C-alpha cells in the first residue's frame, strides 16, 4: 500500500528529538552528528509520514563497530544501495530502536553518511 502525503505534523520534530536522544545514548562512543533531513524536517511542508534521519560518522573506519550497535538495537543494514558513502538501515519492527520502554516509533529511514 502506498504511503500518502500528509499535512505537516509538529509531532515529527518531537519524534525525531526522541530518536536522536536514544541514538546519541547508544552511540556515545562515536564522533557523530544526528540530523533530521527530508520533507518531515521542514515546518509547514506536506510530506510522507516517514522521518529521514542521517547519522554523520566522522571516522569512516568506525562504520563496522557502529553497525554492530545499530543491529543490536533492532536495525537491519541494507548497505550503500547504490549511493557511495551512505549506508541505509531499516527498522526491524515498529519498536526499533529497541529501548527498555518498548516504545513504538514513527516510521523512519536511517542513514549513516561520511
Stretches with model-predicted labels:
Residues 1-48, 56-114:
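Catalytic core of pol beta-like nucleotidyltransferases
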